[in-house]
Design a protein with these regions (language model features):
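Short internal loop-to-helix segment that lines adenine-nucleotide cofactor pockets
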Residues: 71-92, 139, 155-157, 170-224, ...
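Core alpha/beta nucleotide-donor-binding catalytic domains of modification enzymes
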Residues: 124-127, 131-166
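Conserved Class I S-adenosyl-L-methionine
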Residues: 244-257
């Protein structure tokens, strides 16, 4: 068990990397205290993300990532702002590991009525919340599936974490092993079955199974050349018997370049770098998109930094 000092150091180190905390530290503490009280009283909450005209229903769970949405709002993650430079009306966004749907909601507003969002969330905990948020925002351009994506059609165990956003196909031995059986589908098959013949941006956050998802989308990647936002999570990948760099290596073989998002790209101290972070993969021929993303605040090309396994 970690000592209170170690827990504080970890929390403080995390907060210092968050753009929302640095912009408004006092407001972050006040909102966190409010969220703690809401969790004690079992009070579910709806927050407004005014920048995108989005409302988010958040279940009261102190361990859940909902507290970060509540505390940081529009500054929750730099990827949300990045969507504004790579999505526009009429485009198609695929959200793999949608959880409560914050990316789904924001993308839906950005692509408009002429566009479409396809969201996947397998968990019995999170899928009803995703559905509730779709209804809350009256989104008619979202197609949602209770399924996990992989490289082939099958079934598997999804292991629950204290925070539903950490649910994984790979078991964490430090947890109690609560699990549910979920459907696995390849993205290529789902798109074909639903007559979707365009994909512009894919976000993949599946706790280490990113490589499997991308292999199941190989035809779409080669045909549509979408921009991909994916999580680099070597610890979770190892629990699935996958290479930490498997997703990156596969995309590199398809002619993608990489941009590291946010403050993990700027940290000089390896101890303060997160053990997982997000990467944007951009087809080499999409020069304009690469320029827009690379020049966004806090981002730089992946070749200019090092992954944790290289440190």
């Amino acid at each position: 068990m970690k000592s209170p000092l170690k827990k504080f150091e970890r929390t403080w180190g995390f907060l210092k990397t968050q753009h929302g905390f640095r912009r408004a530290p006092l407001l972050t503490f006040l909102r966190s205290a409010s969220w703690y009280w809401r969790c004690l009283s079992g009070m579910a909450t709806i927050v407004d993300l005014h920048r995108w005209n989005v409302q988010m229903f958040l279940p009261s769970n102190w361990h859940g990532f909902g507290k970060f949405i509540f505390a940081f709002r529009e500054n929750y993650e730099p990827e949300l702002t990045c969507l504004e430079s790579i999505l526009s009306p009429g485009r198609v966004f695929v959200d793999v590991g949608a959880n409560f749907g914050i990316y789904t909601m924001v993308a839906s507003r950005l692509v408009g009525k002429a566009g479409r969002v396809v969201a996947f969330e397998p968990s019995v905990q999170s899928f009803p919340v995703l559905q509730k948020n779709i209804a809350l925002n009256n989104l008619e351009n979202v197609l949602s599936f209770r399924a996990a994506l992989s490289d082939k059609e099958s079934r598997a165990w999804l292991y629950h974490a204290l925070d539903p956003s950490g649910n994984s196909l790979g078991r964490d031995p430090s947890l109690d092993g609560v699990r549910e059986e979920v459907v696995l589908k390849p993205l290529d098959s789902v798109l074909e079955e639903n007559g979707i013949d365009r994909v512009d941006v894919i976000k993949v956050d599946v706790e280490g199974a990113e490589e499997l998802v991308l292999h199941g989308a190989a035809r779409s990647l080669k045909t549509y050349r979408p921009i991909i936002i994916f999580e680099y999570n070597p610890g979770c990948a190892a629990r699935l018997g996958l290479s930490p760099d498997g997703a990156k290596d596969f995309l590199q073989s398809l002619g993608y370049e990489f941009v590291v998002l946010g403050d993990c790209a700027k940290s000089k101290n390896p101890a303060l770098r997160p053990t997982y972070f997000n990467i944007i993969a951009i087809p080499k021929q999409s020069v304009s998109a690469l320029v827009r993303v690379t020049h966004s605040e806090g981002n730089r090309k992946f070749s200019e930094t090092k992954t944790r396994t290289e440190l």
